[in-house]
From Swiss-Prot:
Described function: Allows the formation of correctly charged Asn-tRNA(Asn) or Gln-tRNA(Gln) through the transamidation of misacylated Asp-tRNA(Asn) or Glu-tRNA(Gln) in organisms which lack either or both of asparaginyl-tRNA or glutaminyl-tRNA synthetases. The reaction takes place in the presence of glutamine and ATP through an activated phospho-Asp-tRNA(Asn) or phospho-Glu-tRNA(Gln).
Key word Ligase present: yes
UniProt-recorded name of the protein: Aspartyl/glutamyl-tRNA(Asn/Gln) amidotransferase subunit B
Family statement: Belongs to the GatB/GatE family. GatB subfamily.
Pfam families found in the cross-reference section: GatB_N (PF02934), GatB_Yqey (PF02637)
UniProt-listed Enzyme Commission number(s): 6.3.5.-
MF GO annotations: asparaginyl-tRNA synthase (glutamine-hydrolyzing) activity; ATP binding; glutaminyl-tRNA synthase (glutamine-hydrolyzing) activity
Length: 481
């Protein structure tokens, strides 16, 4: 069998977080009643004219700068003509030969190596409506159309065909999502459709420079789905070529339930859309002053923030990576770390405990019931010896479920650590007397028996005993027996 490699390019649609649509004043709010956010403009009724929302251009420029693109001084809109039930005008206002930006890139890390993925272009366009099907698409008796999404502003980010594996595709999309979220121009919620990804994929024998025949894959609504769909499609294409077959250029749909791609329609070429300049919109001229005004609003982006976390807080690259996955998480960590002397300890609690609790509860960091300063207060109780490490986890979980301050929880539940040697000595004596076999085992060289006895003491004190003091006291007493 010949060795093949995949050639993958991604087309990512990002819904911009503006209050109104790209060419009219209708709301962009998600989740309204079907066809409640519509007007004659977004429904394409006769006699209406589009008016460009300047905020859309601002946000598109911001994305282009964050992705290292060259922003055009002059760009225009075009009509993309096609017929589909979710497109009321029978054309989409998009950009064709003069897009807003081109020649950008982002970098991903693959097996410890940095790889640069080119971005061919970024252009602005309006979204289409949404078809709602009853049950399975293959057997549904009818489809309904919700036009609320029609005219919602999008940018389409087109990668160069630099991606070679499904894993690289997933890493690219994860990085792109993080960068866009950091800029604040979109919430990038894949489950709500505000970040959508189509993949173009072909395979070729290793060493061959010419591209193979590509297919386009749609309907991938998660990072995992993207990777799985590409893995399946690459294997499907290789199998066809190995059997002497020919790849058909077509659009395919990822079927999540069956974990396969299914043919939808033949793939269109650009000339099929009969692009021509949009006659109802003037070209957009972007001068240097406008560009620099937007550049000044760019936040610290994920890579720069990750590097600073390593240098400023002494974090490992991995911990810095986890904490900078979203802007909100990075902000939360910094707020907690600034009030405490040991930023590494804060990172450990946020990554190992807080994220675990958030995941279990299905919550985002923005919904976190623990305030950043409460983590600092709890760590200070730990440093003072007021609570033990084990009790700290109990307190932390209670903070998460109740939102109360750690001092209040410790007082209410009587969780102050026992450090009084007299009190500890009485418990140690009681446990030694109650467990003669474990004592004998320890004296015979079985070190595990000591752990058992420590566990019994912690159980007796409900975890409030100071572990170091218990260990030392127990060893001293056992040595005298």
């Amino acid at each position: 069998m010949r060795e093949y490699e995949a050639v993958i390019g991604l087309e990512v649609h990002v819904e911009l977080k503006t209050n109104t649509k790209i060419f009219c004043n209708c709301s962009t709010e998600f989740g309204g009643d079907p066809n409640s956010h519509v007007c004659p403009v977004c429904l394409g009724l006769p006699g209406v004219l589009p008016v460009l929302n300047k905020k859309v251009v601002d946000y598109a420029i911001k994305a282009a700068l964050a992705l290292n693109c060259e922003v055009a001084e002059y760009c225009k809109f075009d009509r993309k003509n096609y017929y589909y039930p979710d497109l009321p005008k029978n054309y989409q206002i998009s950009q064709y030969d003069l897009p807003l930006a081109k020649n950008g890139y982002l970098e991903i890390e693959v097996d410890g190596q940095v790889k640069r993925i080119g971005i061919t272009r970024i252009h602005m366009e309006e979204d289409a409506g949404k078809l709602v099907h009853q049950g399975n698409l293959a057997v549904t008796p009818y489809s309904l159309v919700d036009y609320n999404r029609t005219g919602v502003p999008l940018i389409e980010i087109v990668s160069a065909p630099d991606i070679r594996t499904p894993e690289e595709a997933r890493l690219y999309l994860e990085k792109l999502k993080a960068i866009i979220q950091y800029t604040g121009i979109s919430d990038c919620r894949m489950e709500e459709g505000s970040l959508r990804c189509d993949a173009n994929v072909s395979v070729r024998p290793k060493g061959q420079k010419e591209f193979g025949t590509k297919t386009e894959i749609k309907n991938m609504n998660s990072f995992k789905a993207l990777q799985k769909a590409l893995e399946y499609e690459i294997a499907r294409q290789i199998e066809i070529l190995e059997e002497g077959g020919r790849i058909i250029q077509e659009t395919r749909m990822w079927d999540e339930s069956r974990q396969v791609t299914l043919s939808m329609r033949s793939k269109e070429e650009a000339h099929d859309y009969r692009y021509f300049p949009e006659p109802d919109l003037p070209p957009v001229v972007i001068d240097r002053e406008w560009l620099e005004e937007i550049r000044a609003t760019l936040p610290e982006l994920p890579d720069a923030r990750k590097k600073r976390f390593v240098e400023q807080y002494g974090l490992t690259p991995y911990d810095a990576h986890v904490l900078t996955l979203t802007r909100e998480l990075a902000d939360y960590y910094e707020e907690a770390a600034k009030g405490y002397s040991n930023p590494k300890a804060v990172a450990n609690w946020v990554i190992n405990e807080l994220l675990r609790l958030l995941n279990a509860a299905g919550k985002e960091i923005t919904e976190c019931p623990i305030k950043p300063e409460q983590i600092t207060k709890m760590l200070e109780l730990l440093d003072k010896g007021t609570i033990s490490g084990k009790i700290a986890k109990t307190v932390f979980e209670e903070m998460f479920s109740s939102g109360k301050d750690p001092e209040v929880i410790v007082k209410e539940k009587g969780l102050v650590q026992i450090t009084d040697l007299g009190e500890l000595e009485a418990v140690v004596d009681k446990v030694i007397a109650a467990n003669p076999k474990a004592v004998e085992d320890y004296k015979n060289g079985k070190e595990k028996a000591l752990g058992f006895l420590v566990g019994q003491i912690m159980k007796e004190t409900r975890g409030r005993a100071n572990p170091e003091a218990v260990n030392q006291l127990l060893r001293d007493k056992l040595a005298k027996l």
